[in-house]
Every structure is written in C-alpha cells, then in structure tokens.
Amino acid sequence: YVKGGTVTTDAAGGAGLFAYGDGTVYAADTTIKTTQDTSGGIHAAGGGKLYAWDLNVETDGESAAAIRSDRGGGTMVVDGGTYTSNGVGSPAVYCTADIAVKDATLTANGSEAVCIEGLNSLHLFDCDLTGNMSDLSQNDSTWTVILYQSMSGDSEVGNSTFQMNGGTLTSKNGGVFYTTNTESDITLKDVDITYNNDNEYFLRCSGNNNERGWGESGANGSDCDF
C-alpha cells in the first residue's frame, strides 16, 4: 500500500508501481514519473491486481503506457487522477487485462489514446481521453483507439471490449476507432467527441497489411459490434 509521496524511475523496464501474479497494489495520492522505454506508470501482469486513487502519473519513454498491462493480464481499477504518456507507442492505457477507470484525465501526447489487445476489456466512466498518434510508415492507418490482436502472445485471442460512458474523447491525428484481426465490442454513451481536421474515419473495421504482422493478410479482418 502506497499513500502520498513520489515514485520515480530511470531505467528501461522500470515501472512505477507493478502488480504481478498473486500480488495486489493499493495506491492513493501519489505522484509517479518514469523516463525510459517500457516503463509503465502503473502496471499489472500475470494476474496481478492494482487499485489506484487520485494518482498523478507521467511517462516519457517508448512502449511506456501510463496505465499498462501485459502478458497474463490482471485487474486494474482507477478512480480519479491524471495519467499522461509522452512517448511513441505509449498509449494512455494499454489493455491486456480487465481495466476500469472513473473520473480520470487520460492523455497520450505521442501515441494513440487506447490500445486493447485480444480477450480483454476497458471501461471508462466520465473520463477525459486524448490521443495524438503520429503517422508511421509501418502502419496502414493512424488511429486514436485500437482494438486488435497482434499475435505476439501477450493476450489470449478473443473478443476485445471498449466501453465509454460520459466524458470526452479527443482525436488529435488520424481516425478515431480502428479494429482489426479480432472480434470487438465498442459501446459509447453520452461521450463528447472532438475530431481533428484531417480525420480519416470515425470507425474502421478491416483487415490490415501492418508490417508488424497482425494476422495473415486476407484473413485478418474484424467482426465489430458498435
């Protein structure tokens, strides 16, 4: 249990707070700052559980989501706070777990806002969500929220779920929702959505030719309930 204070890391893979396996983390009113790659702000994997209240979290590295989960999944419950990621490939929320967030500000300054992979779910209630993904040559699209299956083994294959009730969704570059190589459910209610001037699409459900190998081209489409 952590209450108040500051957690800082300056090492690759140096998560701020990490719950793994049978471990459970409780944290409240704490400031967390990570600076290097693969260093999530708050992180759960291998079935770990993490509960957070009113944290101030910022990450600077690549592949360093502010709210991060990883192989083996787990449970993350977040109430209040500010979560900011600044690196490329660092969403505000990277979801390979069951994650619920309420009354929080979630901002990705150099990445998509949300990434959900495989049989996992993200539920947002009255949150302010912002993404600013760069246009990258290895991708055949640019998005703000993605639901997909990467085939990396980080998540079980299955239905990806995104729910947003209330709050705001701001897309600063590219399209809004992109789902590929998976089944997915997207549910929105009372969400104020702001598009960028170069918005490519609101919802794209398709196969892909992504250079990172998200399924086999021609057999990696999406079955989406919106």
Question: Which functions belong to the PLM regions below?
Answer:
Residues 14:
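Blade-loop segments of beta-propeller domains
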